[in-house]
Amino acid sequence: MATTIEVKTPAGTTDGSVELPAELFDVEANIALMHQVVTAQLAAKRQGTHSTKTRGEVSGGGKKPYRQKGTGRARQGSTRAPQFTGGGTVHGPQPRDYSQRTPKKMIAAALRGALSDRARNGRIHAVTELVEGQTPSTKSAKAFLSTLTERKQVLVVIGRADETSERSVRNLPGVHIISPDQLNTYDVLKADDVVFSVEALNAYINAQTARTEKEGASA
């Protein structure tokens, strides 16, 4: 069953309501799936450029440090062996790709579960805009967001062309801004509340509906 939420305005009034489709905002959250998707997402962000030198890559050490026999010490062939200070590293990290392959349907299902969890707890909000007019105002945007939620971490989803809203909240601590096509499980779960502009909410719903219809037609 679709959930209806009110659309708030910066002036403190209500400008109608919007429906959150049940297939996107009221599905059972699969915790294991969300964990898998978030783990893959964070792994893909890793640069993987870490690198250590083996004994063959460390400069120097070509000369045998002392003769093979007669010193009473253990035989050594190079001062760049791992047991020496300044020597190579054994089994150290090497450059690698940490990204994992995650099917698109799993990514979409995890996002639906995360949004549904926030919606069931009343943490999805819809607004007409973050500030009135075309002049950015961090002070006004902060005051408006404080009327929506008192929690610290807020995910703001706005259209790419909404520069006024973006410039108004980009410096606010605890506020993360993304466009509807960038919406992902990690950002939703990290945020306490998700604030959609009506434009962004409709764009997300329409995109997901179109994708579902396309998948149904190709099945």
From Swiss-Prot:
Annotated InterPro entries: Ribosomal_uL4 (IPR002136), Ribosomal_uL4-like (IPR013005), Ribosomal_uL4_dom_sf (IPR023574)
A molecular-function term among this protein's GO annotations: rRNA binding
Organism in which the protein naturally occurs: Mycobacterium sp. (strain KMS)
Domain of life: Bacteria
Gene that produces this protein: rplD
Family: Belongs to the universal ribosomal protein uL4 family.
Subunit structure: Part of the 50S ribosomal subunit.
Pfam families: Ribosomal_L4 (PF00573)
Function: One of the primary rRNA binding proteins, this protein initially binds near the 5'-end of the 23S rRNA. It is important during the early stages of 50S assembly. It makes multiple contacts with different domains of the 23S rRNA in the assembled 50S subunit and ribosome.
Swiss-Prot/TrEMBL keywords: Ribonucleoprotein, Ribosomal protein, RNA-binding, rRNA-binding
GO cellular component term, pick one: ribosome
An example Gene Ontology biological process: translation
Full protein name: Large ribosomal subunit protein uL4
Bilayer-crossing regions: none
Region: Disordered, residue numbers: 43-100
Alphabetical list of NCBIfam families matching this protein: rplD_bact
Ribonucleoprotein listed as a keyword: yes
